[in-house]
């Protein structure tokens, strides 16, 4: 009996040790190298999340699928990478939803000024039916969206003056994304809006080609804009998501098992990235102050004036994304705000 027990125990132990590898071997997974481009540097929240995604893909595929992370816009700005994905010259990327508006107008929904009051609202809408509906417009254009990551609430920096009231924006040369909603929004607010790719931004600030820019705290910190900007105004004027994209040409050639590896890794990376981004954002303002930036918060009354001024822009967004989608989003937000529980 003792010998039988030992044999049984050894069999169970051996099965446990080899179950996971055998499960991977049983899947339809081939050796693949995935070029994954992103715009920020490797020490940014974006870079950290790409690294985690790469680790997860390798783990879930039993080492067969490997991600080559290529940051700092080395493969070009978002728009260039999107075209590379559409043409099948690059496999994956993560970038701003705002730069997709020229490909699918529904993405402009996320550019609506003051759309979300909190990260909780953003998560609920982006990860729910509305976020999926917007993402589902991509395959017809040659792209597949996996998940939304968090870039964060955007805030203003400039080298001229503190922005304490709406009129302080008058005449400031403000870099905006290459996106008509951002262009029209800041023109409407009185700024001289200048569209530029992110990869050219630091140099443009340094040479005074532009006076200022708007980005989340994390990006302001990791991109060292404090070296070329003096004033930071907390406005939270737009919540910016990032989106993890795959070339549809390449995606369609993957097995279901390979697609599942990428999707599962993307979901894991989303949870990590949002937590990491929010924790860093909580520390970033203090760090930016320590770096010498003068920080002020836009008064609520002035934020309300901005909202009123942007009414026309919001109406045009509704028309461009489709009124059914616009109304569905507003109704979903109203339900979230009426529900009991935390609002943050």
Residue ranges and their predicted role:
Residues 1-33, 340-344:
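Short, low-complexity disordered leader/linker segments with a strong preference
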Residues 27-121, 129-132, 136-344:
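N-terminal secretory/targeting leader peptides
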